[in-house]
Every structure is written in structure tokens, then in C-alpha cells.
Regions:
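Conserved short beta-strand elements that form part of the metal-binding/catalytic scaffold
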Residues: 1-23, 76-78, 124-160, 205
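Vicinal oxygen chelate
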Residues: 6-11, 22-23, 28-65, 112-113, ...
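N-terminal beta-strand motif that seeds the catalytic metal site of vicinal oxygen chelate
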Residues: 28, 51, 55, 77-125, ...
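A structural signal for well-ordered alpha-helical scaffolds and beta->alpha junctions
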Residues: 39, 103-107, 134, 174-177
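Short, contiguous alpha-helical
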Residues: 73
Length: 205
């Protein structure tokens, strides 16, 4: 079964994919709630039957923030901050393990592939972290006029990008399909079936 729906004016599609791939924290939705009332309402709803990674509280990076895995296994990051854009729900990538140093590289790569791209914000680690210079903790960027967040997570993690979560590129013709297919499967990407592919960082398209 395939279900198409909208949240905050944004298009989503849900598929019945069977037990082969599990949603995990490597990809989440980052929601800019813009008010205490809204973040509390969303947090309480998503936490029902789910798992709280970061409880709703004040943190160094936000006056009110939470990270929740809902009862279906989908991860949500909630931030009370405002965003100067109509898009309030942003896909967020978490680069971990052998990819922890690759946020900047990946953001530059995707920005070169997609039109109407722009790097909006880059937040590097403090030098005290002992990581190479310019290693990014957080980045926000735009691809084809859609906003995304990317983060890195130090330490060992038991999850990584997989096919449970993929991104749909609506193309105008076969020439455009071929362009994205060739770009995203190059340099270590892999072809899959039925129009799916996995790029060199493990993200599915």
C-alpha cells in the first residue's frame, strides 16, 4: 500500500515495505515549531507510545528542544525556534561512524547535483573536540528549493542510512531521470530496483 499525504503543506509518501529495513535515527524530521504551545502539543502527541531521546527542555543549542521516536519508529526533532521559510519540517541526516567527518563533503556534493541549491549555515565543532578543522557538527542547506539539515554524531552508533527512508525526485523527462541517476550512482553509489538507488553516502533516492 502507498499513501500520499501532506504535513504543514509538505508532500510525503508512506509505503508498506515489509520487515527488511527499519526506520532509525540516521534520518529524522526536524520541526521548527515557533511557539511553546505548538512544540508542547506536538511533543506530547509524538511521545505517546514512543521513545524519548532528548526530553523537551532547554539545551545549549535551543531554548526548547526535543528528540522523539514515535510509535512507528520515525524520529522527530522539535525546536521552538522560528525559521524564515514556509517549510517548517526539514529532513535531517545524521552522519555517524565512518561518515562522521563527511557532513561538509556531502552537503557540497548534493549542492552540486541539484539546482537551486544553497548552503545556508555551517556550524563546525569546537577545536576542543579533537576533530580535523572544518568538521561540521551541523549544516543547513537547500536543494532544488527544499531545505535540509545535516548533523554528525561522534561515538559509536548501531544505525546508519538504509532503504527504510528515501527521497523522491520528480523529473520532467527521461533526460532528467538519467541525469540524477548517473550523478547519484557515481563514485560509489549503487543501482537498485524500480527506480531506486543508493548514493555513495548510503542515502536512498
Amino acid at each position: 500500500m502507498t499513501v500520499a499525504f501532506k504535513l504543514e503543506g509538505q508532500n510525503f509518501t508512506a509505503l508498506n515495505g515489509g520487515p527488511h529495513f527499519k526506520l532509525n535515527q540516521s534520518i529524522s524530521f526536524f520541526v521548527y515549531c515557533e511557539s511553546d504551545k505548538k512544540i508542547e502539543k506536538i511533543y506530547n502527541k509524538l511521545a505517546e507510545g514512543g521513545q524519548i531521546i532528548f526530553p523537551l527542555d532547554k539545551y545549549d543549542w535551543s531554548p526548547r528542544y526535543a528528540w522523539v521516536v514515535d510509535k512507528f519508529g520515525l524520529s522527530w526533532q522539535l525546536d521552538v525556534d522560528k525559521i524564515n521559510n514556509q517549510q517548517k519540517i526539514l529532513p535531517a541526516f545524521l552522519f555517524v561512524n565512518d561518515k562522521v567527518l563527511k557532513v561538509k563533503e556531502a552537503v557540497n556534493y548534493y549542492s552540486a547535483v541539484f539546482p537551486d541549491s544553497k548552503i545556508i549555515m555551517e556550524w563546525p565543532y569546537d577545536k576542543s573536540a579533537g576533530l580535523p578543522d572544518e568538521t561540521l557538527l551541523f549544516a543547513q542547506f537547500k536543494l532544488a528549493d527544499h531545505l535540509f539539515n545535516a548533523m554528525s554524531g561522534t561515538g559509536e552508533h548501531i544505525f546508519d542510512f538504509n532503504e527504510a527512508f528515501s527521497f523522491v525526485v520528480n523529473c520532467n523527462d527521461q533526460k532528467e531521470v538519467d541525469y540524477y541517476w548517473n550523478k547519484l550512482t557515481s563514485d560509489g553509489g549503487n543501482e537498485s530496483q524500480c527506480g531506486w538507488l543508493k548514493d555513495k553516502y548510503g542515502l536512498s533516492w
